[in-house]
Amino acid sequence: MSKTIDVAKYLIYAYEQISNSRFEMQELKLQKLMYFAQRESFALTGEPLFPSDFEGWVHGPVLVELRYFFEQDYVPYNGDSSALSETDKYIIESVINKYGQYDAWYLRNLSHEEMSWKNSRDGLDDSEVGNRIISNRRY
């Protein structure tokens, strides 16, 4: 299993623990929370939280690896967080505390304010499909 998947599973677990509500297989919300977690990791540590790259899609940053996350034999977090450091968990939980209360569309709109996403969409119409990589250096 990739670290990106480990982070996504822990993020869902942390969301459910912190908010005391189900995540309900919200792919759009997962994508945006993962984006903000990656951004937060760069801000706090100078390093990525996970190795996967985001692409600049119409509805914001997307991890292609997670595109069908809930549809492909999704198995929830099982309590094994050995792939994640305490710093990783702190970053994820901080993002949940800061952004978890917002719905997917609010987070989508918030991600559209990010320069990294704007740069990945440069020259594209609002509805035009795009798949430019959002470089880790652009966060």
Place the predicted regions along the sequence by residue.
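Domain-edge interaction signal
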Residues: 1-139
